[in-house]
């Protein structure tokens, strides 16, 4: 009896060594090395976007039904290992989702603490070319849009501030920083 092929997932790829990941990528027709990866990462803010570059440049030779998924997931896993000093959009999204989990479990202040870190990371991704929420969302590709998350964060800071006024002060700082980061967008409205 033929065994059903298993799908790839991030956890399965995380359990592989870096050498095993590169060997698999090479077998799939993506002849990259760790140095190639690091160089490509300088042109991108996300592992998924980096994998799109590979797919445009190389012809994929899948060994199995789900190997196309391996490519983008491997790029995300390799980012954490090979470019630990640069936070990717996927890592920001992971922290954002952690905040939503905390919120769903009734931990509003803990969610806001995680999201304050998310905000600092997002703020650092704003550039002259990426200075609107629309432009940021175009690159972000997270589970939530940055546009929606910004509203959730502001609302939950106010909610957390009911129990601890520190969160009202954080909310004021967040709103001020938001206006500076997205000043072009604010002025256009």
Predicted segments with their positions:
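Generic surface-pattern signal
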Residues: 26-30, 45-46, 104, 127, ...
């Amino acid at each position: 009896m033929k065994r059903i092929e298993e799908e790839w997932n991030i956890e399965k790829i995380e359990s592989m060594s870096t050498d095993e990941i590169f060997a698999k990528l090479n077998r799939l027709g993506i002849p990259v090395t760790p140095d190639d990866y690091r160089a490509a990462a300088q042109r991108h803010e996300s592992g998924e976007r980096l994998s799109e570059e590979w797919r445009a440049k190389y012809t994929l030779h899948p060994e199995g039904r789900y190997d196309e998924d391996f490519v983008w997931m491997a790029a995300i896993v390799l980012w954490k290992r090979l470019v630990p000093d640069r936070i990717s959009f996927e890592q920001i999204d992971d922290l954002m989702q952690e905040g939503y989990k905390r919120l769903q479990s009734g931990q509003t202040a803990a969610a806001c603490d995680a999201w304050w870190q998310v905000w600092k990371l997002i703020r650092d991704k704003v550039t002259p070319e990426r200075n609107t929420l629309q432009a940021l969302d175009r690159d972000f590709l997270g589970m939530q849009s940055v546009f929606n998350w910004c509203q959730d964060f502001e609302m939950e800071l106010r909610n957390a501030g009911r129990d601890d006024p520190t969160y009202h002060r954080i909310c004021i700082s967040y709103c001020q920083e938001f206006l500076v980061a997205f000043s072009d967008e604010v002025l256009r409205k």
